[in-house]
Amino acid sequence: MRMVDLIEKKRDGGVLTDDEIRFIVRGFTDGSIPDYQMSAFAMTVFYKGMTDHETAVLTDAMMHSGDTVDLSRFGDKSVDKHSTGGVGDKTTLIVAPIVSSLGGKMAKMSGRGLGHTGGTVDKLESIPGYQTTLSADAFMRQVEQVGVAVIGQSGNLTPADKKLYALRDVTATIDSLPLITSSIMSKKLAAGAHSIVLDVKIGSGAFMKTLEDGQKLAESMVRIGRACGRNVVAVMSNMDIPLGFYIGNALEVREAVEVLQGHGCPDLTGVCITLAANMLHLCNGWPIEEATKQAQEAISSGRAFEQMKRWIAAQGGDVAVLDNVDLLPQASVQYELKAPQAGYIHHMDAQKIGESSAILGAGRKTKDDVIDPAAGIVLKEKTGAKVVQGQTLAVLHTDRPETLADAERVFLEAIRWGADVPAAQPLIYGIVTE
């Protein structure tokens, strides 16, 4: 089998066999297929696409290119959530305690933030003492005993995806549905959960900017996940505005605590209840109505907040900061950003707001940058609000006052003003089950 023949076959619109796809993934992973041939192959897929079967085989081959996590000891109870990334997305911090307090087993590997999107691991590391690295035995033992463990991603999960993603990033082949699907799903399948709920973010702060593109991705990932033998549901949620009012790391832990204590932002709470209910539907077999009721009661009874404390304590975190969020890292400068004009906020570009937060120190430009856990933004008004000139729109938190002017400029670029009340937007666009 020669790689050049397979590139030619796909270039001419042919359908690759299972063996041909596995040959490509194996050869690229071990280095026998060079970058220039894999780049050419990625471009042929970009233009010619793949069938669902080809995409499923590609996903499976990438999943098995490195280590996989065996969660079979937890049976149907093992469940995971994956977000396609957004701004202010602290849902894992809220959903994990809800689901694990009701019998779900969440053995979760999460990523770090890059660019305008935040990462769950960075948020958790803003809790003093929290350990994001555990041995395999300690990881499994904690899931067994507590019901949840969240750590950073392992070094040798899906090495084929790591190599291919880096190549796609510099060859203009990121926006290919089969390649996006196989990239996301290979990582999720390698992480071992029996059931997976995908939070597909759609809008200005998301990878998928339009509902049409978001729906295509959601449907593709659900089909491929099911073809690979897992229970998969996708929730399509709105990321045209940041989720909740807090953007940053310690700031988002604070907001997660507010939700679990029953007095959080209604929009954020609503999205988390929807995600948790779908996870409980898959792992416990409950009807959605019952799962929703149980998730709501886990918050109102305090059960989910107590579970959060058990989880954080098990990984070495200082639980005192959950009981008193003022003990979390706080920025030395808290600057009130004022509205330059009166009117209705018609649109907030979530990506730009995420970029503003990153400028303050809450995010990274490159993967080696060090973040400031205290930096970020607290929104005081959101899309739909009527404001007067000089009213506080947001509070910028930073330990680097020299970044304020740049961060303020980018934040104000994110806002589109209007004279009348804007149309309300849905929080959830829909749920894909097949």
Locate each region found by the language model:
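Short beta-strand segments
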Residues: 109, 143, 151-154, 184, ...
